[in-house]
């Protein structure tokens, strides 16, 4: 924010500077245009400034102008006098214009030598007409006091020797100020009359043919404002050698700029002008001789006098008539006034009206310069107001900057504190991340354990299913065995009935045998055949009466009876013999015969009893094998029941743990890490498996303790 404000202020300052530069350029262009309209082209004009002791100085006055036909560098091939002015302009970049509080302005120092030498030369002379730039620079006020405020313009004509014109050496008092670096362009000129001195105050000098006997050097410094950006200041090509028997005020003079200056006409002492119109040339010659000035030619002719003629258009040219004279200086020689003591005589053709016209023009020019000074003063005031506003703006910006800087420092402190807090939070976050990673690892381990337990539960479920299927198979086999046992029992019962019938028959037969034995014994004693018929009928009744006897259920009795019957049959068979021819029972001990049909019945009964005994043995063997098989199945069933009970107890324990975990409060659902690791996680698949297994157990044991415990848990 502060940088944006400062950049905006800088842009405003740059815009003001650009406007000021444009204004300065415009003023410089207007002044250059006005100077070009009021200035006449000259070659080299010279004025003589006479010091109080009579010393003469050659100083350039105003910008040096060439004629319309000459270029910036013009080479003259004719013999002319080399008028040199030594003025080294200061560096444009090292000297700046300083504006004082009282409105004064200082200019750069100008060095002058103490002698004037006009040296003739027959060689080519290159005249550099570039205007010399002397920028405004800082000059001490104390050093400016050593310089004469008013330079004495002394006319070298013989009419007013000793008469001085007081004028301000610089036209700064009239207000000629420039916003840019101004240039001081000194030019020298040789004026033929005092009128031309005033007329050509801008520095446009004429070297007249009638005035070269006594050169007049006018000194005025006009300030021009060339575009310093396009042409920097350069040393002047003119040099002035001032030799005087009495020294000047100082070898190095300094000028002081005044806020106000006296009128130019008042400083020229116009009342003494008539006295200067008729001065004798010898007086002037003596004056010049006593002052120590020397005009000498450098072509070997010795001291000579300058003569010339005025052109028809007014300004004189140094190059006119150069080839008509064998001596280069003869063209400037005047036939009216011979040389006396090496000094050229002067002319006395000054005219007062022309001088007044020139002074009027000069005064108008000074008024213009005064107006320009006022305009520049207004510009200066505006610039000062702008500078004050910029200064106040700068102070406000400085205050704002200080405030912003304080805020920025506070923000930096806040940022540092926040950065430290962020670092602390980052440390906590890192610890939380480590804990989260540990918890993630624990969760992964718990998931793995739960998967392992789920696989174990699934394997147990498969085992339980296989056990259940085996149990069902055994139950079916047991039922089949029981049905077979029942069928065998029924067969045994039927066989027992048949056996009992046979036993009863055997008993009846034994009784009949006894009866028959008794009858045989009686027959042997009585021998009657009628008794045999009676015995047969009685035997038949006995056989029929023995058919309804009860059959004993006990196996040992039947076996005993069987053994008894077999023994009886053996005894009977041994004691009796059946004779098939007679079909009569014959007893060994008795001599009676048994009918054949009876013997056949007895034989059939014996075979039937034998078959029944064999079948009984087979049934006993099958029953014993089935009993052993049933015992083995019962033992296997007991073992499977024991295993199922163990698995049921384990499943009940797992179910109880699951229900206990589900019944834990939400605050206790975040146990310690070690507790989580020690506790066996329960997989989600185990619930369904446990429910299915419990259902099977309830079906298998409808009234057992498992149902009671499971109902309590559920």
Curated annotation (Swiss-Prot):
Key words of the record: Coiled coil, Cytoplasm, Developmental protein, Growth regulation, Nucleus, Stress response
Cellular compartment(s): Nucleus; Cytoplasm
Residue numbers spanned by region Disordered: 1-113, 219-261, 288-325, 519-576
Any one of the GO BP annotations: seed development
GO CC annotation, single: cytoplasm
Ranges of compositional bias, category Low complexity: 562-576
Gene3D superfamilies, per database record: 1.10.287.1490
Superkingdom in the source lineage: Eukaryota
The keyword Nucleus belongs to this UniProt entry's keyword annotation: yes
Comp. bias (Polar residues): 36-50, 58-74, 219-253, 288-297, 313-322, 519-561
Description of the deletion phenotype: Pleiotropic phenotype with defects in cotyledon, leaf, flower and seed development, slow growth, severe epidermal defects, including loss of cell adhesion, outgrowth of cells and increased cotyledon cell size.
Ranges of Basic and acidic residues composition bias in the record: 8-33, 92-102
PANTHER family named in the record: PROTEIN BLISTER
Quaternary organization: Interacts with CLF.
Protein name, per record: Protein BLISTER
């Amino acid at each position: 924010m502060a940088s944006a404000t400062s950049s905006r202020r800088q842009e405003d300052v740059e815009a003001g500077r650009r406007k000021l530069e444009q204004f300065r350029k415009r003023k410089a262009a207007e002044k250059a245009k006005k100077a070009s309209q009021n200035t006449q082209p000259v070659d080299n004009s010279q004025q003589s400034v006479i010091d109080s002791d009579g010393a003469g100085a050659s100083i350039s006055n105003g910008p040096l102008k060439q004629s319309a036909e000459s270029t910036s560098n013009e080479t003259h091939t004719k013999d002319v006098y080399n008028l040199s002015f030594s003025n080294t302009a200061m560096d444009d970049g090292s000297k700046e214009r300083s504006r004082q509080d009282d409105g004064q302005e200082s200019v750069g120092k100008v060095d002058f030598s103490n002698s004037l030498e006009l040296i003739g030369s027959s060689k080519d002379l290159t005249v550099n007409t570039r205007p010399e730039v002397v920028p405004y620079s800082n000059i001490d006020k104390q050093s400016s006091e050593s310089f004469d405020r008013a330079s004495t313009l002394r006319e070298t004509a013989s009419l007013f020797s000793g008469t001085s014109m007081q004028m301000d050496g610089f036209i700064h008092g009239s207000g000629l100020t420039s916003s840019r670096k101004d240039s001081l362009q000194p030019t020298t000129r040789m004026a033929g009359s005092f009128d031309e001195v005033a007329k050509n105050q801008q520095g446009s000098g004429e070297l007249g043919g009638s005035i070269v006997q006594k050169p007049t050097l006018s000194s005025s410094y006009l300030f021009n404002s060339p575009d310093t950006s396009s042409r920097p200041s350069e040393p002047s090509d003119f040099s002035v050698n001032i030799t005087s028997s009495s020294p000047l005020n100082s070898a190095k003079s300094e000028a002081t700029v005044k806020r106000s200056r006296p009128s130019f006409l008042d400083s020229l002492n116009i009342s003494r002008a008539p006295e200067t119109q008729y001065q004798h040339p010898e007086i002037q010659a003596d004056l010049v001789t006593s002052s120590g000035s020397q005009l000498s030619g450098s072509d070997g002719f010795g001291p000579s006098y300058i003569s010339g003629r005025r052109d028809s258009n007014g300004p004189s040219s140094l190059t006119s008539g150069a080839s008509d004279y064998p001596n280069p200086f003869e063209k400037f020689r005047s036939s009216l006034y011979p040389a006396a003591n090496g000094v050229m005589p002067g002319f006395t053709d000054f005219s007062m009206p022309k001088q007044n016209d020139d002074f009027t023009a000069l005064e108008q020019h000074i008024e213009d310069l005064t107006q320009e000074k006022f305009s520049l003063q207004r510009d200066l005031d505006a610039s000062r107001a702008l500078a004050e506003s910029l200064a106040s703006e700068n102070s406000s910006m400085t205050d704002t900057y200080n405030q912003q800087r304080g805020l920025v420092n506070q923000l930096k402190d806040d940022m540092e504190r926040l950065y430290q807090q962020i670092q602390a939070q980052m440390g906590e976050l890192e610890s939380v991340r480590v804990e989260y990673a540990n918890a993630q690892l624990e969760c992964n381990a718990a998931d793995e354990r739960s998967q392992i337990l789920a696989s174990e539960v699934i394997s147990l479920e498969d085992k339980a299913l296989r056990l259940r299927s085996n149990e069902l198979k055994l139950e079916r086999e047991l039922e089949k065995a029981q049905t077979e046992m029942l069928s065998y029992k029924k067969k045994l019962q039927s066989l027992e009935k048949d056996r009992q019938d046979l036993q009863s028959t055997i008993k009846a037969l034994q009784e009949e045998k006894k009866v028959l034995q008794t009858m045989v014994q009686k027959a042997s004693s009585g021998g009657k055949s009628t008794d045999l018929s009676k015995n047969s009928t009685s035997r038949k009744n006995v056989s029929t009466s023995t058919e309804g006897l009860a059959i004993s259920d006990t196996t040992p009795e039947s076996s005993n009876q069987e053994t008894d019957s077999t023994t009886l049959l053996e005894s009977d068979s041994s004691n009796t013999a059946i004779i098939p021819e007679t079909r009569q029972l014959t007893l060994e001990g008795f001599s009676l015969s048994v009918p054949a049909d009876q013997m056949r019945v007895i034989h059939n009964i014996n075979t039937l009893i034998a078959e029944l005994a064999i079948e009984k043995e087979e049934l006993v063997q099958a029953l014993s094998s089935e009993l052993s098989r049933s015992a083995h199945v019962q033992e296997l069933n007991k073992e499977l029941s024991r295993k199922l009970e163990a698995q049921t107890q384990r499943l009940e324990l797992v179910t109880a743990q699951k229900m206990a975990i589900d019944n834990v409060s939400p605050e206790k659902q975040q146990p310690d890490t070690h507790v989580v690791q020690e506790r066996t996680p329960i997989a989600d698949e185990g619930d369904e498996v446990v429910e299915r297994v419990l259902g099977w157990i309830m079906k298998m044991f409808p009234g057992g303790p498992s149902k009671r415990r499971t109902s309590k848990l559920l």
